[in-house]
């Protein structure tokens, strides 16, 4: 039965995708079936507009973003940081992605995923699937399609998209592909 606290995508996973994966891959136990663990969202924007970016992404994701800092200030490892190298080069892009991030879990994760899947499936957006994660980089043009910030996008025009990493409990890339295809087939 559909509970008002559950998202349609979460209901679809529990009632359709999970039993389907159990039969397709022939697991011995239903707890072996891959599931979504978390979604990590990292916005791309200039560092001086990080407050506007955090606000926009909090509106879209439904959860507060945490401010992060670089882990070190000197040493060899700092030289290989591509963002620091961009700041020192003549061809500076001015966009950093490590200043704010959010990790979505539970109902908030499924609410965000429902909006994301709707946009991705409509525009046939490419994703990169690895062993236990699904990665995609959303452009600014697709960010405008989120209904929460659609009418007030001029306030958030400095956002240059965001990176999304969907972490699953899958053990192989094939399991991750099957899980992701189950979410994309859902008509929302």
Swiss-Prot record:
Look up the domain of life of the source. Eukaryota
GO CC terms, sorted: mitochondrion; ribonucleoprotein complex; ribosome
Q: Which InterPro entries does this one have?
A: Ribosomal_uL5, Ribosomal_uL5_C, Ribosomal_uL5_CS, Ribosomal_uL5_dom_sf
Per the record, the GO terms for biological process are: translation
Q: Which UniProt keywords apply?
A: Mitochondrion, Ribonucleoprotein, Ribosomal protein
What compartments host this protein? Mitochondrion
GO MF term set: structural constituent of ribosome
Recorded family membership: Belongs to the universal ribosomal protein uL5 family.
Protein name listed in UniProt: Large ribosomal subunit protein uL5m
């Amino acid at each position: 039965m559909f509970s008002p606290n559950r998202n349609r995508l979460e209901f679809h996973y529990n009632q359709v995708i999970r039993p389907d994966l159990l039969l397709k891959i022939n697991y011995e136990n239903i707890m072996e079936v891959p599931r979504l663990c978390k979604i990590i969202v990292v916005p791309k924007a200039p560092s001086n507009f990080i407050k506007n970016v955090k606000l926009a992404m909090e509106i879209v994701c439904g959860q507060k973003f945490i401010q992060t800092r670089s882990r070190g200030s000197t040493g060899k490892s700092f030289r290989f940081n591509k963002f620091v190298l961009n700041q020192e080069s003549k061809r500076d892009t001015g966009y950093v992605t490590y200043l704010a991030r959010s990790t979505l879990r539970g109902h908030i994760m499924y609410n965000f995923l429902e909006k994301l899947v709707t946009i991705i499936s409509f525009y046939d957006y490419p994703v990169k699937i690895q062993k236990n994660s699904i990665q995609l980089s959303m452009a600014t043009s697709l960010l405008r399609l989120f209904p929460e910030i659609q009418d007030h996008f001029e306030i958030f025009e400095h956002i240059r998209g965001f990176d999304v990493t969907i972490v699953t409990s899958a053990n192989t890339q094939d399991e991750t592909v099957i899980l992701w295809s189950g979410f994309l087939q859902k008509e929302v």
